[in-house]
Amino acid sequence: NGRLYRKDLWDEPFTGTVIENFSDGSLSLKTSYYRGLPHGQQVRNFSDGQRALEANFDQGVLVGVKSRWWPNGVIREEAYWSEGKYIGRRLWDRTGRLIKEEITPQS
């Protein structure tokens, strides 16, 4: 069903924050869950601590802007979501030059 459950209570969907760390203890991934579904902000870092990804969820559905960065800290992509539907994106190269911009027609 796509939900995350607590290990000690298999019949209860997990509500809380899941944190994954690199071997040195620094943050790799942080995701908030509500009733087993991603809810709120998700962040992922590169091993050097630089931000790699930020996304926002509303009860398992992507909303707003999902951003990704190159390892050098330059923005790589901004993907736009509304109620789980992909709207469009902008892409940049490693130097920060915008290389693509697309918008999906809404029905």
Feature locations, PLM:
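Glycine/tyrosine- and acidic-biased, solvent-exposed loop/turn segments at the edges of beta-strands
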Residues: N1-S107
